Amino acid sequence: GNPLDGETRSFMESRFGQDFSDIRVHHDQPAAEAASLIKAQAFTTGRDIYFGRGQLQPQTTAGQKLLAHELTHVVQQGNG
């Protein structure tokens, strides 16, 4: 996976009060297939967030909400 881009990371860190430097996002074909298998737009395991096809769109309001939702899982799982 790849780290969050700098602008997105800064935006989310300021709202969560968390360091997301080691979060990895996956939005390739295997990630899309895994999300599809569990009928999810995205899912989180540990500090890795997997996105369905076309779901990683942090430049949009809907994309920010989805990413924030997944980052909440990171924090809730004690990985934040």
Predicted regions and their residues:
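Juxtamembrane/interface and other helix-to-disorder boundary residues
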Residues: G1-G80
